Structures are given as structure tokens and as C-alpha cells.
Amino acid sequence: MRLSTSTNLYNFDRSVPYQLSMEDAMRVCRDAGYSFLDANFCGMSRLGKKEAPMTLDDWDERVRSWKVLADRTGINFRQAHAFFSVKGSITADALPDGEFGEEMMRRSVLAAEVLGVEWMVVHPVNILTDGHNDPEASFRYNLEYYGKWAEFFHAHHVGMAIENMLCGGRHNNVWADIDRLCALVDAIGRD
């Protein structure tokens, strides 16, 4: 059995998130006995945080340095988490976090390719209609949105794993419904 943890496990303190570098997270996780890690690009893509290397001009150099460190220390990145918006539901005419979000998603895929990631998690978004999450509109939006990204993932040899979301907060998350999530995965049709 292979046990894995995420690089943000070590890096996440809700009162002061993303204060520690990816390099430190890798070293501490390796010292704790983990050789398989989930590269959390989402956590490394948050503007205004102390550690947000995916937002920097030299992001690709940082990623290559993570690969060198991983190879030197015996770490394997079999999975990752792509950038995703934490701002909540959007309208059907919007992009999750706009052009910034699109660039962070692109960088996540390219970084995953460099690190040898086999599967990268993405999170579907909820679409608001008349101030409420709309399951049908959300399905259509995510089918088009992640269908587009599936081509880019595939071109860079990274599998896309669409992960469910918890239900809670101001609006119920339509992606907490496992049947809806499975239907989306089947409709996109990529592995």
C-alpha cells in the first residue's frame, strides 16, 4: 500500500494559511516517511499570501526546482490539486477567478506535467440563477468549461480527476450529489 498526503497538510493553518514554502513542505513530509505527495498548486496560487510561487514570473523555475528536490529525496508526485476559485458560486457568463484563474489553471497543468503527476484534481463550480445554485446550469457550465480543459490536460499527459465538494454554507453545493458528479465525469469522457 502507498500512503500519500498533500503538501498543503503541513502548510495549512487556518489562521495563517500558506506561510511555508513548497520546499519546506516536501522536506517535512519526506522526513515523516511520505514518499508519495499530492502537489497542492491551489495553495501555491493564492495572491497576497506569503507563499504564492505559482503567481510569480519565475513560477516555472520554481516548479523545476521542486522536481529536482523530489528526485533527490525520493518523492513521487502521483497526484495534484489544480488551482480552483474559493470565491463561491458564479454566474454563467463568468470564469472562476477570471483571467487570473485561467492562467493559474494553465500553470497548474504545466507544473503537473513537469512533476510527473498522473492525476490532478479539479473542483466543479456552482452557477447561480436568480441568486440560487442551479444544478442544470451548473452541469452545462462545467461540461463546457472542463471539457475545454480536458483537452489541455490530455495534451500535457495529466489525467483530470473531478472531485466532489461538501455541502454547506450559504448555498448548497450541487456537486455534493454523487450521481450528478458521476454524470459530469461520464459526459466529459476523459481519463
Predicted feature locations:
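Distinct, well-ordered alpha-helical segments
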Residues: 18, 133, 139, 166, ...
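Active-site groove signature of glycoside hydrolases
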Residues: 112-134, 156-168
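Charge-rich, low-complexity amphipathic helices
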Residues: 50-52, 91-93, 127, 133-135, ...
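N-terminal pre-domain/capping segments
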Residues: 1-118, 136-137, 147, 153-154, ...
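Hydrophobic, well-ordered secondary-structure segments
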Residues: 139-146, 150, 159-160, 164-166, ...
